[in-house]
C-alpha cells in the first residue's frame, strides 16, 4: 500500500514533536514496517509482522474518520440549504449538485460511483506513488533520479470514488502514468457555471434590486406625506440591503464612464475554504444600475448627483439661483440643441432679464463652449456699440459642472417668423432688411483682425431683437472657428452647406456667404432652396439649379467620387445612387432660379403680383445678388464688401459703411487688401468677379466689358513709404468711389482711348438691358389695367369706346418712353461728354473731401437719369485724373 494514498491526518496520527528521523522510526514501529531509508526512497519491503495491534488502532481511527465525514457533510448541506433559501436576495451563483456522500480529500469531494482525477503537489520525504514505484524497480540510482526529474512535480492516479480509506484492501486500476496531464479547467463545475451564468444572474439581481428600491422609495414618500428626497438634491444613499451586503465603498466620482461591476468583482464561492457553521456572505461591487439608483435624488436625474438627466442636460427648477445673482424663471427651457439648452433668467444685479445657455456636462461640449466664449469676447471687443448685429455675451460661469453663458434676451428666430407666415415667405422689402444686416455681419466677421467663420448660419440662428421690429442678432458660435484654426470637416446644416464642404475641400469665410444666399431665398419663398435628405441628395439638388460644379473643384475634391463619376475623357457626370433614383433628378441646370423666384410672374407662385416693391426690376436685382452668392467656386463668390453695396441692398437714405475695421500690420496677409483712408494715400484692392477679364460696374453689379482682353493691367499705387505695388487687374481692381473718396495717386498704363471705348460700349449694353426690363414691366402693367377695365365694363356696362380710348392713351405712352431712352443714348454719345465729365468730377471730388457724397439709385422704371448716380459711374471710369 502506498503511503501517498493515506489521508494526511492518518499519516500524522501518533506522531510526537521530534526530529523527522524519530517520527519516521515511530511510524515504522507502529505499522510494523522497517524504517525508511532516506538515501534510497524507492526501496520497499513487504510487511511480515502481526497486524493485530494495527487492526484495533485502524478500527478506532476509522470510526473517528466516519464521524468527521458525517459532520463535514452536514455542515456543507446546511450551507447549501441556506444559500438556496437566499436565492432571490443574493448574488451567489447556484448550480445543481448532488448531496455530498464522501470525504473531502485535497479540497475535492468525490461523488459515489464516479471516477475523478486527483491532482496532488509532490511532497518531499514521503514514499513514492504506485506509478513511480512501478517505474523504478531494479534501476540504478542515477536512472531513478533522472526518471524522477522527468516525472515532474505533479502525478495523477485514477481511483474509484469511495475507496482509499484505511483498512480496505484494493488493487489499483490506474492506467500507466501520463506525465504532465492536467485537469481541463472547463470541466470544473464552479468555473464553468461562473463564466456562463454570471451575466444572467447579474441582470436578474440588478432588476430585482432596482424594483425593490423603487418600491421602498414609494413607501417612504407615502409615509412622509411629501415628495421623496431632500431639498438639497444630493444623491440619496442606498437602502439597508445595499449597505449591509456592499462591503466595498464606491469611490469613483466619474458619472460618464462607469465600468462593469463583474470585471473587478471578487470570487463568489471559495471552494478551498474550510468548512464552517457560519454563513459567509461574499462581498459585492455595485453594478451600473445600482450606482445610478444610488445617485438618484428627488430631482429625478441619474447623473451628476441628481442634477442632470440622461442626456447630461441640467434639470431646471423654477426659482433656482445661479452664480448668486441669476434667478431661473421657468422649469422648461426656451430652446434646446446638441450643445445643451437655453433658459430665461432674471439678473438681480442689473435688474434685467437675460438668457443663459447651459452647456451639457460633457468634456467635448465644455471645450467647444470655451472656444465660443473666446470668439464672442473677441467680437464684442471690436464691436462695443453693437453695430454688426452679433449677440452680446454678458458673462459666463460654472454651475454644478455645467458651463453657463449669459446673453442678452432676444425674441423669435427667422424660422419661427416663417411659421407665422404659414411658410409663404416674407416680403421682398423685409428680406432686403435682413440681407443688409447679415451682410454687415459677414463683413465684420471676415475682417482681417477677426477672420471668423460662423460655420452654422441658418434661420434658427438669426433672432429678432424685438418681435415688432426687423433688427436681428446672429447667435450660436458653438461651431465657429477662425480661418487659420479650422477644427471640423463636417460643419454647417445640410440645407445651407456649401459645395466646398460637401466635396471636402478647404473652406474659409465664403461658406457663410453661401448660407446667406440660401437663407434669403428661403425667407422670401418660404421653402428651403436645397432641401436635401442626405449629402448626395443635397449635391444633386444643387446641381439641378446651378448645373455641374467646375472641373477644377471636382479634381481636387476628396469626396467627389461620392457624387460624380468620371469618363475616360475626364468629363464628370452625376453618379447613380444605390437605390437607382438617378432619373428622379432633373438635368443639371434644368431648375431655373428665375422661375423659383418668379422674376416675371410676380414672385413665388405669383403671390406678390402688383405689390409695391415687387417689380420685375426688384426681382432682377434680387436674382443677381443670389446668383453671386451661390457661385460654386469660392473665389468667384461675391464678398461681403460687395454685398453691402449691391443695388438690391442700397437705399437712398442709407449710407454704406466705408470699410471694415482693419489694422495695417496684417494688411498683406489677407486675400483682400484693405487700404486705409486718404491720409495715408492708400486705396483698396478688391477681387474682381472673375479672372482674366475687364469688369465695369453697373449700379454695383459687375459685368464683363465687351471686347475686353484677358491680359493683366499693370496698376501702380503710391504709398507714404514710397513703395510701389503691382496688382494683377485680372483678379483685383481699384474701386475708389466705394471708399467714399478718390485717390489721385493711381496711374494706369493702359491707353485712355481703349478704355473709353470699352466704357461707352458697356453703357450702351446697360441701357439696352434697362429698356428691355422697362418694356416688360410696362407690358405687365398694361395687362393688369386691361383686366381691371374688362371687369369694370362687365359691372357697369360701359361703352366700348371708353376702353379703346384708354388703350390709345397707353399706346401713346410707349413711344414717349422710347424717346427718353433714345435721348439718353444720344446724350452719352455726345462729343462734349468728356468736358461735362470733368466738371462733374470736380464737384464730386469736393463732396468726397467733405465726406458728404451719397450716391443715388437710377430709376429704371421711368428711364430718368439721375445726376448723382451718373457721377458715381464716372468715378468708376479709370481715366479720371483729378
UniProtKB/Swiss-Prot annotation:
PANTHER family: DUAL SPECIFICITY PROTEIN KINASE, SERINE_THREONINE-PROTEIN KINASE MINIBRAIN
Subcellular location(s) per record: Nucleus
Name of the protein this chain belongs to: Dual specificity tyrosine-phosphorylation-regulated kinase mbk-1
Expression by tissue: Expressed in all somatic cells.
Main location: nucleus
Biased composition (Basic and acidic residues): 220-231, 816-827
Reported cofactor(s): Mg(2+)
Inactivation phenotype: No visible phenotype.
CDD domains: PKc_DYRK1 (cd14226)
Biological process per Gene Ontology, one example term: positive regulation of DNA-templated transcription
Species, as recorded: Caenorhabditis elegans
Family assignment from sequence similarity: Belongs to the protein kinase superfamily. CMGC Ser/Thr protein kinase family. MNB/DYRK subfamily.
Catalysed reaction equations from the record: L-seryl-[protein] + ATP = O-phospho-L-seryl-[protein] + ADP + H(+); L-threonyl-[protein] + ATP = O-phospho-L-threonyl-[protein] + ADP + H(+); L-tyrosyl-[protein] + ATP = O-phospho-L-tyrosyl-[protein] + ADP + H(+)
Protein kinase domain: residues covered: 328-649
Name of encoding gene: mbk-1
Biased composition (Polar residues): 1-42, 843-869
Keyword Plastid attached: no
Function: Possible role in the function of olfactory neurons.
Annotated keywords: ATP-binding, Kinase, Magnesium, Nucleotide-binding, Nucleus, Olfaction, Sensory transduction, Serine/threonine-protein kinase, Transferase, Tyrosine-protein kinase
Group of enzyme by EC: transferase
Molecular function in Gene Ontology: ATP binding; protein serine kinase activity; protein serine/threonine kinase activity; protein serine/threonine/tyrosine kinase activity; protein tyrosine kinase activity; transcription coactivator activity
Active site residues per record: 456
